[in-house]
Amino acid sequence: MTTYKDAGVNIEEGYKAVNLIKSLARETFDSNVITDIGSFGSMYLLNIGNSEYILVSGTDGVGTKLKIAFYLDKHDTVGIDCVAMCVNDILCHGAKPLFFLDYIACGKLNSSKVANIVKGIAEGCKMAGCSLVGGETAEMPGFYKEDEYDLAGFVVGIVERQKAVCGKDVNTGDVLIGLASSGVHSNGYSLVRKVFGIDDNPKVLEKIYEELGLSLGEELLKPTRIYVKPVLKVLERVNVKGIAHITGGGFFENIPRAFPKGYFAIIEKGSWEVPAIFRLIQEYGKVEEREMFSTFNMGIGMVLIVSEEDVDLTMKILEQEKVNAWVIGTIQKGEDGVVLK
């Protein structure tokens, strides 16, 4: 059985690091900080005239999905991933993205490669409806290999305080609606690379798998879906109680972040079609089911939590916005967490 830890990623150590960092960050908080470390986005209160608004910020990267871009020498879509990882996070609080900044660090500056990366970032910003206002490109010889780079982003969005989504009103019987992902998105690539032996044999990325209908490389470089515009449409008409972006940590880590302690989510596994890429990963790597749901999005990139009476309207809006979605579970009172059924 192959695990994420076998591939070099220690989730538990990551949790320990966050817990050590929390107290240091809290020492810097002023009275306008209204979320603790660990939320999808960081919320900062603004008083503007008679209204209260919240700035919601987030930062993220693309992870080792970049390795696939290096092997295929294709760099024009990873920027979309970078934007998606950031804007989808702040969307979990109902925030509309305002502006975005990027950070590119490389071993040797290649102007055409950087332009291709930023082309993707700009495309992602257009898809999210935000402005790309700046960034930093750092050339670091001897630190990165000449043909490699790292990519990260930072976004700021805004939401009226009374409309902010924070999960506090989630209750027993509320319904989880899963929004389709475009594929693996930007998490779990260290495990993917291990399962398919990509680092030892990058040529495997050119192999066309019948189950996928395209090459492995094409499948793995599909950009992360940006949910901003369809979900903001839902938020205009529906009281969405909680939103979870399914990223690192999969279902088990991210869904509980969208509701209070003392509740758990029951997920009906057969309620949506798991994309072929995840079945291949599980089969080739002999990865246990729980490990799959702890590492990957399994075809569900975002989860909305709504009251039962709002399900039909939510599904109708998502259909109008051309987003495939399914009712995938319910909220129950009890021990915190997620139960796969």
Curated annotation (Swiss-Prot):
Pfam families tied to this protein: AIRS (PF00586), AIRS_C (PF02769)
Domain of life: Bacteria
GO biological process: 'de novo' IMP biosynthetic process; adenine biosynthetic process
Gene Ontology MF term list: ATP binding; phosphoribosylamine-glycine ligase activity; phosphoribosylformylglycinamidine cyclo-ligase activity
CDD domains: PurM
Assigned GO CC terms: cytosol
Keyword Ligase belongs to the record: yes
InterPro entries in the record: PurM-like_C_dom (IPR010918), PurM-like_C_sf (IPR036676), PurM-like_N (IPR016188), PurM-like_N_sf (IPR036921), PurM_cligase (IPR004733)
Compartment(s): Cytoplasm
E.C. code: 6.3.3.1
Annotated catalysed reactions: 2-formamido-N(1)-(5-O-phospho-beta-D-ribosyl)acetamidine + ATP = 5-amino-1-(5-phospho-beta-D-ribosyl)imidazole + ADP + phosphate + H(+)
This protein's UniProt keywords: ATP-binding, Cytoplasm, Ligase, Nucleotide-binding, Purine biosynthesis
Pathway recorded for this protein: Purine metabolism; IMP biosynthesis via de novo pathway; 5-amino-1-(5-phospho-D-ribosyl)imidazole from N(2)-formyl-N(1)-(5-phospho-D-ribosyl)glycinamide: step 2/2
Enzyme class: ligase
Listed HAMAP family: AIRS
UniProt similarity note: Belongs to the AIR synthase family.
PANTHER family: TRIFUNCTIONAL PURINE BIOSYNTHETIC PROTEIN ADENOSINE-3, TRIFUNCTIONAL PURINE BIOSYNTHETIC PROTEIN ADENOSINE-3-RELATED
Name of the molecule in the record: Phosphoribosylformylglycinamidine cyclo-ligase
Organism: Caldicellulosiruptor bescii (strain ATCC BAA-1888 / DSM 6725 / KCTC 15123 / Z-1320) (Anaerocellum thermophilum)
Organism lineage: Bacteria, Bacillati, Bacillota, Bacillota incertae sedis, Caldicellulosiruptorales
Gene: purM
